[in-house]
Amino acid sequence: MINFQKARDRMVETQLVSRGIHDRRVLEAMRKVPRHLFVDEALKEQAHSDHPLPIGDKQTISQPYIVALMTQSLELQGHEKILEIGTGSGYQAAVLAELAERVFSIERNPNLAYRANQTLQKLGYKNIIVRVADGTLGWPDEAPFDAILVTAGTPKIPQPLLDQLAEGGRLVVPVGDRLAQELVLVESGPEGMKHTNLGGVRFVDLVGKWGWEG
């Protein structure tokens, strides 16, 4: 039988620390969150592998390094209100919930949203709200957000998300075509929005009014 805690520890050391993930809070969150509970039973032994895994409905759970990179880029301190676009399995939301005060997560697929919510509730997370909606529209009723994380690729950054980012906030989003994207960090400041390229990635499509057509 696999010792999943040891598997997580090994994942953190060999995949995250070795590639420059240095935020201690991010590393501890990823040591703690039971990644194997967010994948199908048949894939549990692969849960900590260095690649994405299918979660059904043509969606995936991102590889651990990408989860860590995106999370670290938000520079969370613990007091933040976060918007996540693309709940998927719920794993990224769980990691964020370990590091921030509240997480508002949007998933357009009702089946995925239901399964993710069930898993998160079983694990006892009280600071995550999952909603079925078009993520490209954001969550206006709860805006502004200190941080926004988008877990799907978009041809351009949805304007509603930029509008809902608090001053001093940080947004991480994959931007590009359907085959490959660049991971972009947007920082909102008094002089406007600063964009930084964090490197090449490949995500499933962000479908919605301000993303790709379904």
Curated annotation (Swiss-Prot):
EC number(s) on file: 2.1.1.77
Keywords: Cytoplasm, Methyltransferase, S-adenosyl-L-methionine, Transferase
Gene Ontology molecular function, alphabetical: protein-L-isoaspartate (D-aspartate) O-methyltransferase activity
InterPro entries: PCMT (IPR000682), SAM-dependent_MTases_sf (IPR029063)
An annotated GO BP: protein repair
Active site: 62
GO cellular component, one term: cytoplasm
Principal subcellular localization: cytoplasm
Keyword Coiled coil set for record: no
Subcellular location, record wording: Cytoplasm
Catalytic activity: [protein]-L-isoaspartate + S-adenosyl-L-methionine = [protein]-L-isoaspartate alpha-methyl ester + S-adenosyl-L-homocysteine
Superkingdom field: Bacteria
Family note: Belongs to the methyltransferase superfamily. L-isoaspartyl/D-aspartyl protein methyltransferase family.
Primary role: Catalyzes the methyl esterification of L-isoaspartyl residues in peptides and proteins that result from spontaneous decomposition of normal L-aspartyl and L-asparaginyl residues. It plays a role in the repair and/or degradation of damaged proteins.
Protein name: Protein-L-isoaspartate O-methyltransferase 1
Organism: Syntrophobacter fumaroxidans (strain DSM 10017 / MPOB)
High-level lineage: Bacteria, Pseudomonadati, Thermodesulfobacteriota, Syntrophobacteria, Syntrophobacterales
Gene responsible for this protein: pcm1
